Each structure stands twice: as structure tokens, then as C-alpha cells.
């Protein structure tokens, strides 16, 4: 019996209604911001100030023009860090300050917080 490989089949085409240029532009901009954050995180990792990105706490300066696309984004989730604070400034380029997160590590979500998660349940997981 001859089997045809899944790798030889064609993918279904997405309906044109799935194309959302505004959403695409938003995520392209968010990825640019995340890349700046990742560079800052990697500098701290290279200098051995932090181990993983979850040991990092970010302060992100963004131009006010980016408020519309980023106000509903949790940058700690996007950048996989323990915390992230966003500050909007007039005519500002994207700048990131990375510091070592303070507090204790949750055994459930692995984030480092000053308000330690209960070891049995984690507020991050109940949201």
C-alpha cells in the first residue's frame, strides 16, 4: 500500500476576510518594540546580571504615538519577563532599561514578584 506524504499536500488558502492590514501593522510595530527589549535583555544576560529573561524587569519608553497600538499589550508577557512598565513620552524613540527583577520566584508561573505568589495557586494563572 502506497502512502502519500503530508508534506506533499497543499495548505488551504485563507479566506480574504482574514486579512487585516491594521492588525498586521500593529503586530509589526509590536515586534519591533519587542526586538529592542530583547537586545536590552540579552546585554544583561551577556554580562551575567540576569540568567533567563524571567529574571528581568523592564522599563520601556515609547513615543506617545504608539499608545494606540500598545495600551492593551502586556509587555511582560510579550517579552517573557517578570514585569514591564511602559512610559509614554512626546517625540521619544523606543528605549528600554532592563534591571534584575526583585522578589521571589513563583513555582507555578516562574515570574519574580515582590508580592510572592502562593505556592499552590498563582494569581497569574487565575486571571
Predicted regions located by residue number:
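Extended, charged helical/alpha-beta scaffold domains that provide interaction surfaces
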Residues: 55-79
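Acidic, turn-prone loop/beta-hairpin segments
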Residues: 1-40, 47-64, 89-97, 116
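Terminal, compositionally biased segments used for targeting/anchoring and flexible tails
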Residues: 84, 120-121, 125
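Short functional micro-motifs and their immediate structural scaffolds
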Residues: 111-117, 127
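Short cysteine-rich clusters marking metal-coordination/redox-active sites
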Residues: 106-109, 119-122
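Histidine-centered, metal-coordinating catalytic motifs and their short helical/loop contexts
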Residues: 41, 110
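C-terminal edge-of-domain segments
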Residues: 73-107
Amino acid at each position: 500500500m502506497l502512502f502519500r506524504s503530508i508534506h506533499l499536500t497543499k495548505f488551504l488558502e485563507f479566506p480574504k476576510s482574514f486579512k487585516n492590514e491594521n492588525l498586521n501593522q500593529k503586530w509589526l510595530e509590536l515586534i519591533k518594540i519587542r526586538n529592542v527589549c530583547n537586545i536590552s535583555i540579552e546585554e544583561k544576560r551577556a554580562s551575567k546580571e540576569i540568567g533567563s529573561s524571567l529574571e528581568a524587569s523592564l522599563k520601556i519608553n515609547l513615543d506617545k504615538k504608539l499608545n494606540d497600538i500598545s495600551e492593551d499589550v502586556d509587555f511582560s508577557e510579550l517579552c517573557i519577563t517578570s514585569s514591564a512598565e511602559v512610559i509614554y513620552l512626546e517625540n521619544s524613540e523606543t528605549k528600554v532599561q532592563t534591571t534584575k527583577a526583585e522578589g521571589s520566584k513563583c513555582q507555578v508561573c516562574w515570574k519574580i514578584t515582590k508580592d510572592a505568589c502562593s505556592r499552590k495557586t498563582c494569581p497569574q494563572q487565575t486571571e
